[in-house]
């Protein structure tokens, strides 16, 4: 019987099945043709499944039980900061005073919401060392694009229109090159040195009067802090460029160091990562962009301002890049992030970063000897393994990741960053206990032993999932995302 609930909801359909019977119409019936233009009307009925209520409930309940999230288990997805999200944040975001707002309400009726946005901006400025923030961008890559548009507007306002190049290290966050290209820049990639840091000589070689800026993730996607960051900032600024901070890895440095103090001019953050709001299917996200005062005039409109205790939206910003999305950003996510910041406080945020770094280094040391470490030095909040320490037939990182699923763990990020062969990128976050980290490490060690003793066990994993190993290349290149008869 359970087998049929492994089917698509459409495959459960049987003609004549009904979940509800509607009562007789008690108002005058009107043809749709009288109310809607012809081009908006279907020529045939929509092909919806015919199922009973119990079919629907069982189908979606069983689907939910097959799901995996941070509330179920350890989720060490590198470069994603899958930390536990305190439920008080959800309670705050569910308050009727927030949920019943409408973006078209007069400003006088939404003073509390505007104050929250204003105070959140101030908090983010304090955490990052920036002077102003826009809360509009919907997620990280949208924040990147917004920040790059600000950089472009800044150079064009100075009539320095030849600056068409953005430098991106090979260890940068994965979306950086794409965002730069979408913003209309030419992307110049520079290689990392053997320590996983930016090669200063390689940077000097590409800096010139055509460079608009350098995009940098610090710590990098190798989980390493860029120790020469002050010198890098000096070189970029002397060449007339701006320094852009991708906030993907801010969780490692809250309360310890600030991008603004390092010399960054523009930053974007991920409220859905660092500031504990659900993501990875539990969205939406939020990617605020912060700038130094020299760039504040270019921020998207509207900004939230305060005068004599009254909060208002300011559209009168002639140099602004304009609107980057409808309304004012993903407000629900802002509530959760602000709740998290207030709950943690300055010392709590600092402690969170310290524990994130401690957990990552603890795991790395436990796994050394069984797996190769890409750059074997003290890491920040995450680290990158480079496959098994001892080659076992043709067992690959993909096989290790699939085998982890059999043991109840979500696999880490694999094959990223691209500069590491057989990469396994692990970010434990600060919210996991030593017991969880030990269990995860013991499982990875057990898998390393299995790879030597029974490699086929890994090659055929996972063994215990409703769907076994998929052809992921085929799924990516030829996705079937729509059901048809």
Curated annotation (Swiss-Prot):
First-level EC class: oxidoreductase
Keyword entries, A-Z: Oxidoreductase, Pyridoxal phosphate
CDD domains: GDC-P (cd00613)
Keyword Transcription regulation on entry: no
N6-(pyridoxal phosphate)lysine modifications at: 273
Cofactor(s) needed: pyridoxal 5'-phosphate
GO cellular component terms, semicolon-separated: cytosol; glycine cleavage complex
Catalyzed reactions: N(6)-[(R)-lipoyl]-L-lysyl-[glycine-cleavage complex H protein] + glycine + H(+) = N(6)-[(R)-S(8)-aminomethyldihydrolipoyl]-L-lysyl-[glycine-cleavage complex H protein] + CO2
UniProt-listed Enzyme Commission number(s): 1.4.4.2
Assembly notes: The glycine cleavage system is composed of four proteins: P, T, L and H. In this organism, the P 'protein' is a heterodimer of two subunits.
Family according to the record: Belongs to the GcvP family. C-terminal subunit subfamily.
Matching HAMAP family: GcvPB
Name listed for the protein in its UniProt record: Probable glycine dehydrogenase (decarboxylating) subunit 2
Source species: Caldanaerobacter subterraneus subsp. tengcongensis (strain DSM 15242 / JCM 11007 / NBRC 100824 / MB4)
């Amino acid at each position: 019987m359970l087998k049929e609930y492994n089917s698509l909801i459409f495959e459960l359909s049987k003609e004549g099945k009904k979940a509800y019977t509607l009562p007789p119409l008690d108002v005058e019936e009107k043809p749709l043709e009288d109310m809607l233009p012809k081009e908006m009307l279907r020529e045939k009925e929509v092909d919806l499944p015919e199922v009973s209520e119990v079919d629907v409930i069982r189908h979606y309940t069983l689907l939910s039980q097959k799901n995996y999230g941070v509330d179920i288990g350890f989720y060490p997805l590198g470069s994603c900061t899958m930390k536990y999200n305190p439920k008080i944040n959800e309670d705050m975001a569910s308050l009727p005073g927030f949920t019943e707002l409408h973006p078209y309400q007069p400003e006088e009726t939404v003073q509390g919401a505007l104050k929250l946005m204003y105070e959140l901006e101030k908090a983010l400025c304090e955490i990052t060392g920036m002077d102003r923030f826009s809360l509009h961008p919907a997620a990280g890559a949208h924040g990147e694009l917004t920040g790059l548009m600000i950089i472009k507007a800044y150079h064009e306002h100075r009539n320095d229109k030849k600056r068409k190049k953005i430098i991106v290290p090979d260890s940068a966050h994965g979306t950086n090159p794409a965002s730069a290209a979408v913003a209309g820049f030419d992307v110049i990639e520079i290689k990392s040195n053997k320590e996983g840091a930016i090669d200063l000589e390689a940077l000097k070689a590409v800096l010139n009067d055509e460079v608009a800026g350098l995009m940098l993730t610090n710590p990098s996607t190798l989980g390493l802090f860029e120790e020469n960051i002050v010198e890098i900032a000096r070189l970029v600024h002397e060449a007339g460029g701006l320094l852009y901070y991708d906030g993907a890895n801010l969780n490692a440095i809250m309360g310890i160091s600030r991008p603004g103090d390092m010399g960054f001019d523009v930053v974007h953050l991920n409220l859905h990562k660092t500031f504990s709001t659900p993501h990875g299917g539990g969205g939406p996200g939020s990617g605020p962009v912060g700038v130094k005062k020299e760039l504040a005039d270019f921020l998207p409109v509207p900004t939230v301002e305060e005068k004599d205790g009254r909060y208002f939206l300011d559209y009168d910003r002639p140099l602004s890049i304009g609107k980057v999305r409808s309304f004012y950003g993903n407000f629900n996510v802002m509530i959760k992030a602000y709740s998290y910041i207030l709950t943690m406080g300055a010392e709590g945020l600092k402690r969170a970063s310290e524990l994130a770094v401690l957990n990552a280094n603890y795991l790395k040391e436990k796994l050394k000897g069984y797996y190769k470490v890409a750059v074997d030095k003290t890491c920040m909040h995450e680290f990158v393994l480079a496959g098994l320490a001892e080659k076992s037939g043709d067992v690959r990182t993909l096989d290790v990741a699939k085998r982890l699923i059999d043991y109840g763990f979500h696999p880490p990020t694999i094959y990223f960053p691209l500069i590491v062969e057989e990469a396994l990128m692990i970010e434990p976050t600060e919210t996991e206990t030593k017991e969880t980290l030990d269990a995860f490490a013991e499982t990875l060690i057990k898998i390393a032993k299995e790879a030597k003793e029974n490699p086929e066990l890994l090659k055929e994993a996972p063994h215990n999932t409703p769907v076994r190993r998929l052809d992921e290349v085929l799924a990516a290149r030829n996705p079937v995302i729509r059901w048809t008869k």
